């Protein structure tokens, strides 16, 4: 059974190193970690985007808790963010609010457990201590990102198929494509286009993706 959830949540993320000027600094946990967490910082406009995925597995079944968030003014300690559901097959129609707090090298996510519909309230606790704790009616997710990078943003594919393009031009479509739910690291953008890298099982794929094929806030 897939999880149905919309999170009215307070996010506190501690650990995003912000670099001003011409340098870029973004962070991620290892892709196999549970929960997986990645954050992109765009120094040009101070925008932060991020993604979190937590899984609960059982024989023949995997339940997911995934979200995508975005905030502005990353040079400040507290950032208001918008949050959307990033779980495949579930609606992204509801826009929720949260907050990011930036300190040191630790990311912490605090969720009001009573506001988690569906099975998300038992997917997150399933991950267990020390990544997930429950205190005073809240689920607290803590991760330590070890991978730094230069991506400017994080995105998630919404279309059933999102083809790669050699250039930001419809005439340059390639055979390779991504599917709904795939996560992207965005390195550049043109009107209507993202230049992205996607880490596949065997190799990294890069190219241009149409913005309209991704989840938008």
Write out the residue ranges for each language-model feature.
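SH3/SH3-like beta-barrel fold
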Residues: 181, 194-199
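Long, low-complexity, proline- and polar/charged-enriched segments
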Residues: 80, 86-151
């Amino acid at each position: 059974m897939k999880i149905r959830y919309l999170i009215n949540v307070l996010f506190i993320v501690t650990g995003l190193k912000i670099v001003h000027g011409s340098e870029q600094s973004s962070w991620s946990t290892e892709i196999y970690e549970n929960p997986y967490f990645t954050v992109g910082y765009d120094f040009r406009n101070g925008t932060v985007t991020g993604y979190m995925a937590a899984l609960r597995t059982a024989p023949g079944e995997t339940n997911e808790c995934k979200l995508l968030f975005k905030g502005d003014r990353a040079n400040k300690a507290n950032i208001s963010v918008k949050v959307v559901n990033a779980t495949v097959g579930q609606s992204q129609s509801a826009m929720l609010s949260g907050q990011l707090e930036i300190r040191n090298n630790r990311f912490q996510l605090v969720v009001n457990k009573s506001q988690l519909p569906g099975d998300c309230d038992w997917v997150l606790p399933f991950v267990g201590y020390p990544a997930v704790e429950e205190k005073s009616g809240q689920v607290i997710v803590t991760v330590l990102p070890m991978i730094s990078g230069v991506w400017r943003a994080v995105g998630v594919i919404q279309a059933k198929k999102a083809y790669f393009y050699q250039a930001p031009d419809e005439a340059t479509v390639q055979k390779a494509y991504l599917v709904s739910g795939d996560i992207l690291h965005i390195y550049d953008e043109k009107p209507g286009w993202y230049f992205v890298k996607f880490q596949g099982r065997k190799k990294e794929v890069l190219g241009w993706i149409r913005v309209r094929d991704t989840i938008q806030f």
